[in-house]
Swiss-Prot record:
Neurotoxin. Keywords: Disulfide bond, Knottin, Neurotoxin, Secreted, Toxin. Its main location: secreted. Expressed by the venom gland. It comes from the Eukaryota. GO terms for cellular component: extracellular region. This is U11-ctenitoxin-Co1a. The keyword Secreted applies. It comes from Ctenus ornatus. One of its GO terms (molecular function) is toxin activity. The keyword Disulfide bond applies.
Amino acid sequence: KKCADIDQDCKTSCDCCE
């Protein structure tokens, strides 16, 4: 999954923080 913003729901919606 990809988030709209890496600083928005990244740590709660998907793994785009890595």
